[in-house]
């Protein structure tokens, strides 16, 4: 069980990701999916997932941290899940992401976060939609054959 932590409107400066994640790491909290969105106003939103049981601790660390660099709102969203499609050669198969996102959209499952690598596409969804998402992707990619 995971939580999503969003740190909004922090300065978009070199090293901001390290400033955010260093105290989280020092507290022994593992971070999973990370997304950073830079706005046109020189600020950034920084979002990541952690295990539910450590989410309150992580949010408190960030609230204390934001006071040190002048702003930033911390939002904690509990009960999210990561669902992934994994396969060697994912990068060379065009359309896998669109197919994945389409299958979820057809089931009215909203995607909160997206992370990709050469062999995996992961999405973060509401925990109560995770099982339905897994079934939708299983059906879409015909994994029972």
Residue ranges and their predicted role:
Residues 1-145:
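A conserved regulatory-domain signal marking ACT and ACT-like small-molecule sensing domains
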């Amino acid at each position: 069980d995971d939580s999503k932590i969003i740190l909004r409107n922090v300065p978009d400066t070199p090293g901001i990701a390290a400033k955010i994640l260093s105290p989280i790491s020092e507290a022994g909290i593992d971070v999973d999916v990370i997304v950073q969105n830079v706005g046109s106003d020189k600020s950034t939103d920084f979002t990541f997932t952690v295990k539910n049981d450590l989410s309150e601790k992580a949010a408190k660390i960030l609230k204390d941290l934001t006071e040190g660099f002048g702003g930033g709102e911390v939002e904690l969203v509990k009960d999210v899940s990561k669902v992934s499609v994994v396969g060697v050669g994912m990068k060379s198969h065009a359309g896998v992401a669109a197919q994945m996102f389409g299958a979820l959209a057809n089931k009215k499952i909203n995607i909160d976060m997206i992370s990709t690598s050469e062999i995996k596409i992961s999405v973060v969804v509401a925990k109560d939609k995770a099982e339905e998402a897994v079934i939708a992707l299983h059906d879409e990619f015909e994994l029972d054959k």
